[in-house]
């Protein structure tokens, strides 16, 4: 099943993620045909159980699809839609058609929810929501005045947005909520997977995406080094270039191992259906994955651009579709320093013996 789904996804991205589509996306043109193909393939509902009308894909397979979409630099909120749809279905809500996103995406932002007659009132300000107003609906994490974690699904066209973009020219809009009234059935208790917010889940999907983009960037560099000739021989024959590529490959391998471990443990715990105890145990591998992939992103992006020289900085060369995403994704849902500090906090709270057991098993 896994191989079939990945093969289907690869074919889809190869057919629909063209240079023209990517260039149009940089100019804020929504890739209608690509999104339609993704929806028709059922990929947007990959993490929605079959009994709820979804695909019910195993969690690790869903993450592999996310990784492949990042390899292709698909300019769509597939990862965000997968996770938001899966979480909303767990609350018993009906998953709407179209693209989804989620927020807040950092610890500094928060939304409060006050119960009102016939519904809820939401207040707060959220920065840099992925895809923001371009998505059809937004899954918002909020905390009630009683301290209960909640999720609310709100149509994006009813919200007050300020347009922003990241380095990859993807929408990262700012949302202002000032007494927004929503119906009672648009708000549900948050599943265990996101009771404390979306930061860990976001870090998990960004780590998978960065591995995909790292692989594509390294593919570009290896191809260029093999084809480009200087002083009568290919760049790959020069020892200095070989050392740079070896360094990049080493960081890619370490980042992949960290992301693979987080994906495997998340899948074994039940994915989005993981209970509170399992979610707490997943904090460590997710922190390691996000910190290590973020570190690799900066190093590998610098190396592959050095290998390409001036050619790699041109708009016409596809390398920037991978590296601009790497530079953006490494800072989203917590950068390296945040997750390195989280690793330290977890180690100190559990003691050295627990760390050794964690590393040795």
Model-derived segments and their meaning:
Residues 56-65, 100-109, 181:
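Structural signature of FAD isoalloxazine-binding scaffolds in flavoprotein oxidoreductases
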Residues 172-202:
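A short, charged helix-loop
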Residues 110-121:
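Cytochrome P450 C-terminal beta-domain/meander region
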Residues 1-70, 200-361:
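Alpha-helical interface subdomain recognition
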Residues 113, 158-165, 181-188:
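Short secondary-structure junctions
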Residues 24, 74-91:
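N-terminal glycine-rich flavin-associated loop
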Residues 125-159, 164:
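A short core secondary-structure module
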